[in-house]
């Protein structure tokens, strides 16, 4: 994935938003909560209406008139730069989906101030950078936010409140933190864990991490699947610090193998599969996430992790690295 300086700026934003939302609670007091916030709902609103990897016929029919066609056309023009999936994404997805979605801003002026702040940071780090495209995207975001807050968000919020209550009732009973810490040997150090529900984009990427303790999800999925994925994603977040460097290393490694096979999915698939594997172990049964990754070879990876575990390998990072190498060996590749 080609990176831009705005991707680095987006990383800086996620660090700041993590700090803002992290209450630094001790292990025994950690809460996992479902929340409704306008920012992530606005981002998915734009992504859905413009068709940037998200679609929702019911939502689009209801709200397509809330954004000018010319503005949607601007976003569509840069679809490849804004879309994301399977651990990859366009160079501006980090800024305009993940960073903006994880921020807090009360109106269009606050949104503009946030974007201007990080645009200045980008220009200081790389003087003379062409900002034409991000400026055009930012203008669409700023110009349409106040109208969204007035005409769309109140009903969208109301639509999600019943599911929010159901999720929080069950999340209070769940023991995800203790279960995952016991299974992995890792400790959670990022305070309360936030699930941000979004109304638009029924067909599109869900479970998108916005910072170290904040995730996002389409609100109205199968309840059993949603709870299984809440556990799955907490595992991803818990293991992220140890596996992220290996993930990047393996992305580079698989690209250099000199094969015509598409291996871009392997590092992502191995990580999702590892979380599925632990989730099954924690639950003592096959959980609903196990067969939900259509583009990941989860069953093969889980068999590999079974074998490595039987050899006495328990550390998630070691399971991940060795699991990828064994998977590549099955494909006739790697060392």
Locate the predicted segments by residue.
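Auxiliary, metal-adjacent structural segments of Zn-dependent hydrolase domains
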Residues: 152-209
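N-terminal mature-domain "stem" immediately C-terminal to a signal peptide or N-terminal signal-anchor/transmembrane
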Residues: 22-108
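Active-site recognition of the HExxH zinc-binding catalytic motif
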Residues: 227-245
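Post-HEXXH active-site segment of zinc metalloproteases
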Residues: 241-271
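Pan-zinc metallopeptidase signature
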Residues: 287-335
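Active-site scaffold of zinc-dependent metalloenzymes
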Residues: 196-227, 240
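Bacterial Sec-dependent N-terminal signal peptides
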Residues: 1-24
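Long, mid-chain structured domain cores
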Residues: 77-177
């Amino acid at each position: 994935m080609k990176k831009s300086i705005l991707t680095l700026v987006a990383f800086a934003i996620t660090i700041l938003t993590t700090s803002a939302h992290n209450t630094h609670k001790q292990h025994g007091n950690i809460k996992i909560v479902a929340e409704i916030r306008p920012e992530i709902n606005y981002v998915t609103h734009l992504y859905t209406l413009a068709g940037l990897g998200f679609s929702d016929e019911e939502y689009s029919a209801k709200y397509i008139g809330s954004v000018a066609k010319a503005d949607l056309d601007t976003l569509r023009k840069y679809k490849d730069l804004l879309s994301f999936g399977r651990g990859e994404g366009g160079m501006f997805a980090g800024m305009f989906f993940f960073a903006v979605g994880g921020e807090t801003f009360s109106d269009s002026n606050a949104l503009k101030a946030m974007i201007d702040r990080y645009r200045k940071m980008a220009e200081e780090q790389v003087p003379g950078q062409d900002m034409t495209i991000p400026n055009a995207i930012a203008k669409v975001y700023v110009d349409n936010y106040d109208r969204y807050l007035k005409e769309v968000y109140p009903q969208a919020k109301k639509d999600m409140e019943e599911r929010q209550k159901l999720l929080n009732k069950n999340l209070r009973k769940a023991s995800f933190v203790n279960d995952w810490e016991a299974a992995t040997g890792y400790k959670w150090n990022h305070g309360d864990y936030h699930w941000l529900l979004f109304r638009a984009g029924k067909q599109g990427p869900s479970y998108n991490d916005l910072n170290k303790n904040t995730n996002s999800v389409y609100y109205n999925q199968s309840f059993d699947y949603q709870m299984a994925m809440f556990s799955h994603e907490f595992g991803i977040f818990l293991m992220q610090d140890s596996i992220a460097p290996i993930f990047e290393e393996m992305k580079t490694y698989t690209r250099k193998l000199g094969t015509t096979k598409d291996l871009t999915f392997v590092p992502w698939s191995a990580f999702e599969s590892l979380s599925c594997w632990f989730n099954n172990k924690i639950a003592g049964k096959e959980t609903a996430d196990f067969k939900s990754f259509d583009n990941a070879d989860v069953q093969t990876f889980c068999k590999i992790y079974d074998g490595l575990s039987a050899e006495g390998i328990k550390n998630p990072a070691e399971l991940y690295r060795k699991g990828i190498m064994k998977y590549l060996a099955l494909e006739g590749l790697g060392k």
